Amino acid sequence: DYIVEAIEAEGGVVFAKSNTPEFEAGANTFNEVFGRTLNPWNLSRSAGGSSGGAAVAVATGMAFVAQGSDFACSLRYPAAFCNVVGLRPTPGVVPQ
């Protein structure tokens, strides 16, 4: 993975994989293996999808930064739901 290699080349440590929905797409972060990812500020609400696990990890302090994709706002929605910043790079700047 290009992003992982770039992070490690700069001295970063990739230490975990957060929860994502099956096929990495969906309005909620849910899968049959790990279940639903809950909003850290209100457990009755969604963390959004599909990068909900990444947004929760940042919101709760488990990670300083997280990487995800933004197909159909799947990075920006979880960021907004979990009150963290989600940045969508300019298309073509970050290899897919």
Protein language model features and the residues they cover:
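Glycine-rich, flexible loop motifs
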Residues: 87
